[in-house]
Structure formats: structure tokens, C-alpha cells
Curated annotation (Swiss-Prot):
Protein name as annotated: Thiamine-phosphate synthase
Functional summary from the UniProt entry: Condenses 4-methyl-5-(beta-hydroxyethyl)thiazole monophosphate (THZ-P) and 2-methyl-4-amino-5-hydroxymethyl pyrimidine pyrophosphate (HMP-PP) to form thiamine monophosphate (TMP).
Known pathway: Cofactor biosynthesis; thiamine diphosphate biosynthesis; thiamine phosphate from 4-amino-2-methyl-5-diphosphomethylpyrimidine and 4-methyl-5-(2-phosphoethyl)-thiazole: step 1/1
Binding locations of 4-amino-2-methyl-5-(diphosphooxymethyl)pyrimidine: Q45, Y46, R47, E48, K49, N77, S116, K145
CDD domains assigned: TMP_TenI
Family: Belongs to the thiamine-phosphate synthase family.
Chain residues that bind 2-[(2R,5Z)-2-carboxy-4-methylthiazol-5(2H)-ylidene]ethyl phosphate: T142, K143, T144, G173, V193, T194
Name of the encoding gene: thiE
């Protein structure tokens, strides 16, 4: 069995960080990622839809260097070419991106492939595609993705917990005030975007989120 590089970090992660420059209070993605790493986040995804390709490449090169040094799993959203160029640990695909099985042909056996899902049918299909994990959401309404579907709610999360064998990351509109609902439904790894990148003190925010998660696990 092939062991994907960085997969252990993903499987052990409680919080999954995602970049979003426009919500980062004027800080660069490099500054935010540095603070995420300092806060102990073990998986970081680079997701920037609107930036020029060259800028994405340069940012990802630096983030790859930072995450590798810190032992943090680094995922690139959507762009398989970018993930390959910077030697990322993985790539995360949407339902309208390249088919996961064809991406596997491109990236080989050692790269993690994640896939966003929004319904039971998509989750069941993902189990047959050879992806390593799925995104489950959006759980709640979110402003960071303009083309996203309506919230799927906690019901879909509960379906995945009970019926799907793949590791998963809960995502979409998750904040400090509702993360307990997500954690208590069985989500072990939770992605937050604006709640983390938009925090003045990222380390303190992550500490507060973890305190809530740990209370729900007790």
C-alpha cells in the first residue's frame, strides 16, 4: 500500500487552515501561514481564486518551504499544475474541476487528493474514485466561495460520519460560535477560513477553537 506523503498530518489534524487574502486584515498570505504554523495547525491549503498565476506560484513556493520545514501538510486548491510545480503534498479538487481519477494519473501515487462533496451521492462516488479524503459542506452559509451551493447542514455531515469510510474535513461557515455543533456530530477535522485568517491574534483564536473541540470530546 502506497503511503501518501503528508497524509498522516491530515489524518491527525483537528483544524484545517485555508488561505483567503482578502479577509486577512491586510496581512500577506505568507504572514498568515506563518501564524497558522506557529499556532500548531498541521494542514494548510492554499486557496486563492483571483490572483495572477505567477503570484500564486511565488506564494506557494514560499509556503511549501515554510510548511516543509515545520512538518505541516501543504495542499493546493484546484490547480494540479501548481501543486506539481511546488511539490505540494496534495491537491484539493471541486466537483467541476478535473476528474479525480485523471488527476491521479498526473500526480502519481504519493500525492494526496481531496475532493469537495455536497451530497450523499457525491460522497459515495468519491469512495470509488481513489481520493484520500473528502470535504463535507458547506455546513453553514459562507461568504468565501461565491459559486458554492446552498448549505448542506449538519444532516449531511451526520450521513458521512455514519456511512462513508473516507477521512473527511467539515467546511463552510464554521465559526467559534458553531464549531461545537460540528465537532459533536463527529467531525474530527474542521476547516475554517475567515474565522482564522480574519482573527487579529491567530494563535489565540486557534487556542480558543481547540478548547471548544476538546470540551466536546470529553
Amino acid at each position: 500500500m502506497v503511503r501518501r506523503r503528508g497524509l498522516s498530518g491530515l489524518l491527525e489534524a483537528d483544524i484545517y487552515g485555508i488561505t483567503a487574502w482578502e479577509y486577512s486584515l491586510g496581512r500577506s498570505n505568507i504572514e498568515v501561514v506563518a501564524q497558522m504554523i506557529e499556532a500548531g495547525i498541521k494542514v494548510i491549503q492554499y486557496r486563492e481564486k483571483e490572483r495572477p498565476a505567477r503570484q500564486k506560484y511565488e506564494e506557494c513556493l514560499k509556503i511549501r518551504e515554510m510548511t516543509r520545514e515545520a512538518g505541516v501538510t501543504f495542499i493546493v486548491n484546484d490547480h494540479v499544475d501548481l501543486a506539481l510545480l511546488v511539490d505540494a503534498d496534495g491537491v484539493h479538487l471541486g466537483q467541476d474541476d478535473l476528474p479525480a481519477d485523471r488527476v491521479r494519473e498526473l500526480v502519481g501515487d504519493k500525492m494526496i487528493i481531496g475532493l469537495s462533496t455536497h451530497s450523499p451521492a457525491q460522497a459515495r462516488a468519491a469512495e470509488k474514485m481513489g481520493v484520500d479524503y473528502i470535504g463535507v459542506g458547506p455546513i453553514f452559509a459562507t461568504k468565501t466561495k461565491k459559486d458554492v451551493c446552498d448549505p448542506v447542514g449538519l444532516e449531511y455531515l451526520e450521513f458521512v460520519v455514519k456511512n462513508i469510510s473516507l477521512p473527511f474535513v467539515a467546511i463552510g461557515g464554521i465559526k467559534e460560535h458553531n464549531i461545537a455543533e460540528v465537532s459533536s456530530r463527529g467531525a474530527k477535522c474542521i476547516a475554517l477560513v475567515t474565522e482564522i485568517v480574519g482573527a487579529e491574534d491567530i494563535k489565540a483564536k486557534v487556542r480558543a477553537l481547540r478548547a471548544i473541540i476538546s470540551r466536546k470530546e470529553d
